[in-house]
Amino acid sequence: VSSDSMEDIIDYQLTPSIHDLHQLNHFTNILVSLGIKNYPIHIKLNTGMNRLGFDKNEINDLCDYLLAQPEIKVEGIFSHLAASEIVEGKDLTKKQINSFQELSTLMESKLSIDTTKHILNTSGIENYSDHEMDMVRLGIGLYVGSKKPYNSTVASLITRIAKIRNIKKGDHLGYGLDRIKKNMKIAIIPIGYADGFKRNFGNGVGKVYIKDSFYKTVGNICMDMSFIDISNTDLNVGDRVEIFGKNNDINKVAKSINTIAYELISSISNRVVGVYLKD
């Protein structure tokens, strides 16, 4: 994390997660330069995912460092589960939870503090609710349940029909030399792989929802445009097209191209305009 980013964290009074001594030392030096003391942080522990976080053999050095730094206040300790959504991952998840409880208790004892502890992600909340501790981290669960249907949809990806064409059998459509195998009525929608509507959805793999019905893609997904087969309908330019949302479940959409909802949501590009609705 750059110095500018860390200063932004301080300016906006955010709480950083710290995962190694280099990062901690860098952040502490900035606090010293600004004359700030008791700034709250959350410490991340590596309990088995082996991505970010302090390892067990680093805890003593970490605690020694923290005891010598009045600029830092350890407000929370957390870790991240690697396989909480997988039935076969139960042993690993339990091992991670036990390791986290051991290491966080050790830290609290050495530092003589009481912290906010958290390890459960969305799947962890669903499958290991007896380990909620002091807080949980509902990430993808804000948008979709990882397994269970939720009562409301927080996010939808919406576009509208930009143009309608009647294409004859044998005509070309979009990029490539493939020809249409039958007469079709085609809706062109202004969304493509540059927006996050992946090329894998092309040629009938993807389905969109328009006015109470599902319609398949046809042809290749372009960078900025896609084609939908709307034959035998009375749809019009401007009609609302749901890529995923209340009527087109994102888990099913993701499964159709052998991926997960996380990837679809995180793939939506910055050029897609976000509209925030308040109930």
What are the language-model segments listed below?
Residues 1-4, 20-25, 94-279:
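Active-site anion/phosphate-binding pocket segments in diverse small-molecule metabolic enzymes
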Residues 1-116:
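Active-site-proximal beta-alpha core segment in soluble small-molecule metabolic enzymes
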